[in-house]
Amino acid sequence: MAFNQIQFQHGMSIPEFLRSFGTEAQCAEAIKAARWPEGFRCPRCSSSDHYVVGHGVRKLFQCNGCRHQTSLTAGSLMAHTKLPLTTWFLAIYLISQAKTGLSALALKRQLGVSYPTAWLLHQKINRAMATQDAPHQLSVTVQLDDAYLGGERTGGKVGRGSENKVPFVAAVSVNDHGHPMFIKLNVVRGFTSEAISKWAKSNLAPGTSVHSDGLACFSAVADAGCLHLPMVVGSLKPRDLPSFKWVNTVLGNLKTTLAGAFHALNYRKLG
C-alpha cells in the first residue's frame, strides 16, 4: 500500500523541538539570529556599534551612535511579555503543528497557564500567521471552490442565501507535481461577479490557471488576468474530481477543526 507523501512528510517532533528550544537561552539566541542574522543593527540608525545593558534574555542593546535602546522582543508579538520565551515558543509550536486546530482551552492545559493568557497567546500567534501570509498571491495552478460556514436555524433559509451562513472562498495553489503549496480562506460579501473579481485581484497572480466548478461568478477571475477553467461537476463524487482534490481536502480539514477544536464560532470574528 502506497503512503501519502503529504500526510507522512517529516515534521518537527516534540523531542526535536525541546532539544532546539527547550531553554530561555536557546529561544533568545533563535530570536537574535532571526532578527539580526548578520549581527546587531540599530532599528533607528542601522549602526552596528553597540553595547549590552543588563544580562540574560531581558538584556537591552544600546546603540553607541544614537543611544537608542532595544530588546530582542521589541516590535514583535512578544514585546513587553512577562511570560518565559519557552512558553511562547512552545505555544507557537503547538498551534502551528496542530493539523486539526487547537483551541485556547486546549492550549491552556498544554502550557499550564491561565485561560486569559492562553487566549491572548492564541489570538496573537494566529493573527501573526495570517498577517504574514495575507500579501502572498496564489499562482501557477489554483483549485477554487465556494463554501459556507454556519449551522441550522429553525424557520430560516437553507443553503445559499441563509442568514445563518457566512460565504467564503477556498483556494489552494498546487505546483507542477500536483502538490499543494498555499491556501486562501477568505470571507466574501457573496458569490457575485463583483465580489469574486475583487477577491481575485487581491489573492491571485496574473496568468494563474484557475480550476473551479460551474458557478457563474467564478468567471470573474479573468478580471485579475487569470485563465478560468470551469468544470460542471453535477452529481460527481469528490473521488471523481482530481482537479478539486486539495481544495476538498482543505474544506474537510476545516470542518474537522471547527467541530473538534472549537465546536462553534462567532461569525462576526470572520469579517
Residue map of PLM features:
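Residue-level recognition of single "structural anchor" positions
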Residues: 1-271
